[in-house]
Amino acid sequence: MAKITKTFQYGKHTVTLETGEIARQAGGAVIVKVDDTVLLVTAVAAKSAREGQDFFPLTVDYQEKFYAGGRIPGGFFKREGRATEKETLISRLIDRPIRPLFPEDYKNEVQIIATVMSMNPDIDGDIAALIGASAALSLAGTPFKGPIGAAKVGYKNGEYILNPTVTELKDSQLELVVAGTANAVLMVESEAELLSEEVMLGAVTFGHREMQKVINVINELTVEAGTKPSDWVAPAKNDGMIAALKEAVGDQLASAFQVRDKLQRRDAISAIKKDVLGALAPRATIEGWAAGDLAKEFGELEYQTMRGSVLSTKVRIDGRALDTVRPISATAGVLPRTHGSALFTRGETQAIVITTLGTARDGQVIDAVSGEYKENFLFHYNFPPYSVGECGRFGAPKRREIGHGRLAKRGVLAVMPTLEEFPYTIRVVSEITESNGSSSMASVCGSSLALMDAGVPIKAPVAGIAMGLVKEGNDFVVLSDILGDEDHLGDMDFKVAGTAEGVSALQMDIKIEGITEEIMKQALQQAKAGRLHILGEMAHALTTPRQELSDYAPRLLTIKIHPDKIREVIGKGGSTIQAITKETGTQIDIQDDGTIIIASVNAIAAQAAKSRIEQITSDVEPGRIYEGKVAKIMDFGAFVTILPGKDGLVHVSQISSERVEKVGDKLKEGDLVRVKVLEVDKQGRIRLSIKAVEEGEGVQASAE
């Protein structure tokens, strides 16, 4: 195939799609150029599904090569290692709008690899990767019901910005990524500075409207490349098997879905499945029905039963009305030795959230393609298997845990203090101890309480809620605070976090086409009502940050010195700073601009270290009297330490008003004496006098 190139203007950027020259053995391969940021995105689909495959094995890997930024990786091996958090999050970002566009029965393995090969640090690779994945899949001839487009939306001064740069995002009140087909939005990921629901919805519709040019260009590229449609055909339904299964199940599933407790309901459904499949086993053997096909159709009956019941009765499987939030319990300060903690329970979803305060040196150093930087707010989400009553792998966080942690972090970012306002590194950990839907939003609520319990001056409490949707034709219902089953069997997972004032984070994943602006508007309005209700319940535990830090949290004192004085504080070979930290038991961080941060669990020790530093950096004042210690005896006088690191000479003629024949007759090393500063010359040498003090001149000052 000859090289094909398509170029179009997308916001302020020129986007170029190229195919036919690179990675020609891949099913589909596209070079995506957004100014100087260049990605190679490939898509390969297996010719057939593996024997017994019962799920769609789609994998997406986004990777940023260090050579793209002209850097060599750090570490011993000097090559890229496992996926970073950013790479994992963008991989998920690509997966989410693509997965629902494959047919339900398609089980062939599909792999998408997006490689950043050149990076302009001001143009991130996420949107280019989404565009490239859509184009590569369209070229690969898979049964992909795309293409999709993607756009990033910023918001400043009341106006939306299409595909803002990294620099522009620093001043933007919004960072929103939206992806979808020509007719429908499929995915939204965003963080915002407490914006209204109307502004958020406007950003989604703005992005969807602008991305149409991407979809049009990909369609043109596919036509020019002569891509053949997929020849995959969905397996025919076995009507006889389905009818027999429905007859055997009867109304048992409808009864099981009336059980309110999650585990009891799950056990009841499992028992029905076991009995029904057992009863049908003899006929299945005769008819040649596969056990996997029977199990799959049983799952389809579950899907239809739950959805039909909710649509017809407007009552949910746990007995709630459509807009009712589950019972909430919230407690702050549940763990005695942590810096801040909270227990948040909503129905059968529960999180213990812990906040830990550290110093600047506790921040995480990120070695990125664009350069090193430090992250001083960390949010980690853990989802152990016991939280859903199961056994499972336990260890390093999976992609889902990384994604949920990032979403919860987005939820509270808008209310966090700056490092200047609160100079601590903050780590929040959410331990999910029970889960039945919306555990990431429980993490948002719990983190808000844990941060306030730790004394972090957040601007306002934050709550989060997950919304769901059941839609058949034109009939639909929006569900507030969804259960796990409602998420699994529903058409939408729509998470919203924010304060009473506005939205701080919004994430939406839609499994079907046809989600209208009306549906999104209703979901946002219902989410706001739910969020305000949850904030009211959380207020029973804590409404404002505690005024005092935990007894076990480090106290930070910040002082500012002239940068020229830094070497005096550090001392020769670090001797001075080491002596201060050892004697006071504190931790001291010195920044290049002269900012010094002193950390200690003991406030008195921190104050002592501060006093020492102030003494070292203070200037010696001529005419002032100091109390010092004799450091060294010489024939011509004595050197006296009047401030840490500052010695002056008392000449033999200045020791006493009487004649002194031998310095050692009057002074000994270690003696404490009061001296007056006569002069500090241009070389910084200090002339002192004991005689002048005895004569009563000067103003007294003391120093250790």
Curated annotation (Swiss-Prot):
Chain residues that bind Mg(2+): D487, D493
Pfam family, one: PNPase
Keyword NAD on entry: no
Cofactor: Mg(2+)
GO function terms (MF aspect): 3'-5'-RNA exonuclease activity; magnesium ion binding; polyribonucleotide nucleotidyltransferase activity; RNA binding
Entry EC no(s): 2.7.7.8
Catalysed reaction, written as an equation: RNA(n+1) + phosphate = RNA(n) + a ribonucleoside 5'-diphosphate
Segments forming domain KH: 554-613
Coiled coil: none
One Gene Ontology CC term in the entry: cytosol
Entry keywords, A to Z: Cytoplasm, Magnesium, Metal-binding, Nucleotidyltransferase, RNA-binding, Transferase
UniProt xrefs under SUPFAM superfamilies: Eukaryotic type KH-domain (KH-domain type I), Nucleic acid-binding proteins, Polynucleotide phosphorylase/guanosine pentaphosphate synthase (PNPase/GPSI), domain 3, Ribonuclease PH domain 2-like, Ribosomal protein S5 domain 2-like
Record's subcellular location: Cytoplasm
Residue ranges of domain S1 motif in the record: 623-691
The keyword Endoplasmic reticulum is assigned to this record: no
Enzyme class name: transferase
GO biological process, one term: mRNA catabolic process
Biological role: Involved in mRNA degradation. Catalyzes the phosphorolysis of single-stranded polyribonucleotides processively in the 3'- to 5'-direction.
Assembly and binders: Component of the RNA degradosome, which is a multiprotein complex involved in RNA processing and mRNA degradation.
Descriptive protein name: Polyribonucleotide nucleotidyltransferase
Organism: Xanthomonas axonopodis pv. citri (strain 306)
